[in-house]
Amino acid sequence: MNIKNFIAELKRRNVIKVATAYAIAGWLIIQIATSVFPAFAFPEWTTQFVIIVIAIGLPLSLIFAWAFELTPEGIKKSKEVDITQSVTDRTGKKLNGIIISVLSIALFFVVIERIFFAKASILEDAEVTAQIETASIAVLPFVNMSGDMENEYFSDGLSEELLNGLAKLEDLQVAGRTSSFQFKGTNPDLRDVGSKLGVKHILEGSVRKSGNRIRITAQLIQADNGFHLWSETYDRELTANDIFDIQEEITRKVITELKVKLLPQENIALSEQPTEDIEAYNAFLEATQIETSRRPEDIASAIAKYKEAVRIDPTFSLAYARLAYSYVLLHDYGNASFEETKELIRENIDQALLINSNEGKAYQALSAYFTDFESDFSKSLDAAKKAVELLPNDAMAHNALTNAYFWSDQEDKRNESAKKAYQLDPLNNVIAGNYSGYLVRKEEFEAALELLDEIMERSPEYKNAFARKSAILADPPYGQIGESFKLIYQAYKLDPENRELLFTVGDRAKELDFFTLSEYMTKELERLYPENTTTLDRRFSLNLMSGEFEKAEAIALQLKENYGGERTIFYFRALNYTQGKYKEALAPIEEFEPELMQNPPVLNPSNEGWAGTTVVLFRELGRNEEADLLAEKYCEYLENKEVGEGLRLDEKFNKFSCLLVSNNTDETIELIEDLYFNENWKRRWPEGLVFNTIPTDLKKSEEFKNIVKKVYADLHAQRANVIEYLKAEGEWKEEWEVRN
């Protein structure tokens, strides 16, 4: 066969032009399918089907173009058309027009797709894209080869400090300590590690201590294929300087291999040594490993080790910072005195920052200090931002920022920060638990429960996950308070002195109108954790419910002394409202939310939660014009408030909040019934009917009284089921007998 003649014949029969036109048109159709089908929620296979059909059609169209010709009399076989009468040149011109037209449409589509579809895709997958494009690494715990288990903390601590050094680099994504240490003591598939932690590279190694010598082996591995990019063994004397030199050498080698660009200040930071004393460093490393359990006794042991570190080396700024944060943890998880703990935290933060004004962990502790002990949420946010600036890859710094945004009523930024923390340390129980809260706020309840189940399976000792799951099951859309109680009680049986479990079991009992059991759990809290704020909060609630107002007031005054007036508005509002002291109930709102008192009132995310209460109190005090104006502005604010797409419950709750202040009894009753029985909004009713500011006209209406009866009938049915469960489990106590 003569190739030139064959190609010439292909051109004459327009086979090449048909192929060109088909390829362009096929590409255009595929692009439209891949961009548009997902927007209409078409199944994945529909796009694949389109691609397969187009692929099959290509050879068929070429065969058709070769075998047939379009003539004035219609389609004929090419061999039946006299070459002198062929009109393939005219057909070719038509195909040229088709090609140009299809190319124009394709160009137009590319522009539209880049502006709209691609932009949306980029926004949706920004985190994933950033994760792929950023150099990323996980530092697995180095293996202790010394044969002495007491050296385990040293190898773990060394790994953590390598991780912390890398985490200071802005252009490097580093998996968090907790996630990386999940693989300790295993021989994991590195591809699995890379996939779970979202990293491309793994740093692993071993540590052997012998007398005053140390041998450290480190190797950098590509996660997807196990390829060793670099490996090195270091034999040195066991001194602080030598250890930090090794850490710096390993870090710089990783940076070189991953082609990470260092900022000038980052380059300087890599050479900094936190201490020159090996004994101080040993004590510090041991403390960092002890405190991770969050058990009060372990936190106390870590505090003792941090104290030892700063006693040996009074210039050890990082140890002061970690010591301060350990006191924060003891306040949260244990039974530390408020005033004493407050003083110790501030003292150690100040000392850390005096030695090193850029100690990121000190700013993390400072953020918690301002929230927990000063109620200064603006300063807390500033400190958390500084911590993230200094420690851009530290998941706990981002977690501190998440908490600070919560107290500053910046919901969107809170969500973004929670996602970032989870991206950095997805197997960290604290951070994953917070991320489940983000999923709940997005009304992705099944995903939240699935995540909590994963935490509970891998870390059954982490009781916060049980408490979070219990809360989700009790809340909409489930409303299963009884089943929620059983879940948390099972966890409580295994750890009956755990503060979180005692509180949560008492919470579920209170929501079931089961106050004898709630009282029992509160007494246990008072026995084990008398200084903890959650204990005081629970006792205040029960005192108010039982009409012991003087005792409730004493607790409110103590909390005010600890936290200041703004953070304790609720306590004094509830205390005075319950007693019919409406002027006194309004006073703290007037003091701390003055914008609600303006004419016209000004609403914002910080004060919107008090607007409905203020309307009711205005009406109780006969200030009806102010009440009507604020009610109007409040409803207008709620109507214009942005609610995330698909967040149906948020929309209903906003409507309910508006109806509650609008003197529209019929619609309010109808919506209450819908929320309780259809949306399963069943938590906090017994407490809410006492504490919440419900308009008098509504409370006095027969319709409302009937709804309350139906609510209690449902709650008491769930309570009866719980009592039966407790008796079947052999857990029942006579003092829990329900008293009407």
Residue ranges and their predicted role:
Residues M1-F117:
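An N-terminal, helix-rich hydrophobic module
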Residues A384, K413-N740:
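Alpha-helical protein-protein interaction modules
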Residues A280-D409, K413, K420-E443, R468-D475, ...:
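Short coil/linker segments at helix-helix boundaries
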Residues R13, L169, D313, N692-P695, ...:
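Acidic-histidine catalytic/liganding microenvironments
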Residues E248, P274-L285, A300, E343, ...:
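Amphipathic alpha-helical repeat elements characteristic of tetratricopeptide repeat
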Residues V87-T91, L95-V128, E160-S301, K305:
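Catalytic-center loop of serine/cysteine hydrolases
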Residues I122-D156:
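A structural "domain/chain start" motif
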